[in-house]
Curated annotation (Swiss-Prot):
Single biological process term from Gene Ontology: threonine transport
GO cellular component: plasma membrane
Membrane topology: Multi-pass membrane protein
Lineage: Bacteria, Bacillati, Bacillota, Bacilli, Lactobacillales
Protein name (Swiss-Prot/TrEMBL): Serine/threonine transporter SstT
Source species of the chain: Streptococcus thermophilus (strain CNRZ 1066)
HAMAP family, per the entry: Ser_Thr_transp_SstT
């Protein structure tokens, strides 16, 4: 038994999740009536539901509190590029939804009719009311819009606080992230239960739906990396951006793909910036900041999964509402890339815009974890490589103007 536990701990999380997917599928086919196996998935999703509101609050507030006033203009350009690039990726995901609409196989509760908003006006009204909710109530009721708003307010207010106070907030963020890491380490068992429950109820045909979901996610992220980001870079630099784009992808994406954490990839990106001859005073700030707020891949994941849930429930979405969704996903993604699987925990924030219950939203998160072996790796590769790309683009753009 000790040998088994030791070997299990030495195996990467990606491989363990893959093992869980295979075992869950086999058990779902062979013994579909042993429903107690599905309890593993319910417990896993329950743990995520419990920690998700606090995670959003802590990560966003900490990220914003660390930004400093009076940064040189080059740093401001980088931050604008980070936010605009994330928003552009979110809009790309919306467009891909209209071209390749997909639906998900959710549990029995998905039959419950969601309160579909009647156009952008109602969405805006609900958004405003949720934003001013009591922060404690927002945390306890999983009102992610309220959680996000108050996290932003506290984060900006903390910018002028003492370093000791900021350190307390940073510690809270680290502790919350550690709890999430513990839960994520149980993902193989949770995924086993989720796959078992899905296969036992819907059969192997549901795997085709997951295949389409993976193709849409990865295809959209690839389009952002090879089309959207180069367009942004060309506009800023006025010259061929692809040598810089490919250098960023080549040197940053491999480690990011396997660590599935932009935070863990910071040393690699710092070395790459040094190799590119960039200003260390700039990239020493922009790369760590980018690992927290530069979230193109996360925005794609949030929008694709949310709009898939919306399609599944038969909710009509006009482009104006989808535009608001892109704004919300851009803001809510702040802090997601610092931990493995973080963007999936922010899907309920976007789902709440459409009146989708937290229970249904967490089922969508469960689907995200099933495809997460590929999704999270590709997402992090896009996020992390873009940190370097936009840092370099901002600096080269400044040289062009000088």
């Amino acid at each position: 038994m000790k040998r088994f536990i030791s070997a299990w701990n030495r195996t990467s999380l990606i491989k363990r999740i893959a093992i869980g997917v295979v075992i869950g599928a086999i058990l779902g086919l062979l013994i579909p009536k042993i429903t107690v196996i599905g309890l593993l998935g319910d417990m896993f999703v329950g743990g995520l539901k419990a920690i998700a509101p606090l995670l959003v609050s802590a990560l966003v507030a900490n990220a914003l509190s660390q930004t400093r006033e009076g940064q040189q203009s080059n740093m401001k350009t980088i931050i604008v590029l980070y936010l605009f690039g994330t928003f552009a990726a979110a809009l790309t995901a919306v467009i891909s939804h209209y071209i390749f609409p997909i639906s998900l196989k959710l549990g029995a509760t998905s039959a419950t009719k969601a309160a579909a908003p009647q156009g952008v006006g109602e969405v805006f009204k609900d958004l405003m009311l949720k934003m001013v909710d009591n922060p404690i109530n927002a945390l306890s009721q999983a009102n992610y819009i309220g959680v996000l708003l108050w996290a932003v307010v506290f984060g900006f207010a903390m910018r002028t606080a003492s370093e000791h106070t900021k350190e307390l907030l940073h510690t809270l963020s680290e502790v919350t992230s550690q709890i999430v890491r513990w839960i994520i380490n149980l993902a193989p068992f949770g995924i086993l239960g989720l796959v078992f429950d899905t296969i036992s109820k819907n059969g192997v045909g549901v795997l085709a739906d997951y295949g389409v979901l993976i193709l849409v996610l990865v295809g959209t992220m690839t389009f952002v990396a090879l089309v959207i980001n180069p367009i942004i870079a060309f506009v800023m630099m006025g010259k061929n951006p692809f040598p810089l784009v490919f250098r960023s992808l080549k040197d940053s994406r491999i480690t990011a793909f396997f660590t599935r954490s932009s935070a863990a990839n910071i040393p690699v990106n710092l070395q790459l910036c040094e190799d590119l001859g960039l200003n260390p005073d700039t990239y020493s700030v922009s790369i760590p900041l980018g690992s927290t707020i530069n979230m193109a891949g996360a925005a794609v994941t949030i929008n694709v999964l949310t709009l898939a849930a919306v399609t599944t429930l038969g909710i009509e979405v006009d482009f104006a509402t989808a535009f608001i969704l892109s704004v919300v996903s851009t803001i809510s993604a702040c802090g997601a890339s610092g931990i493995a699987g973080g963007s999936l925990l922010l899907v309920p924030v976007a789902c709440s815009l459409f009146g989708i219950s937290n229970d249904l939203a967490m089922q969508v998160v469960g689907v995200g974890f099933i495809v997460g072996v590929i999704q999270d790796s590709c997402e992090t590769a896009l996020n992390s490589s873009t940190d370097v790309l936009f840092t370099a683009v901002a600096e080269k753009s400044r040289w062009k103007k000088s």
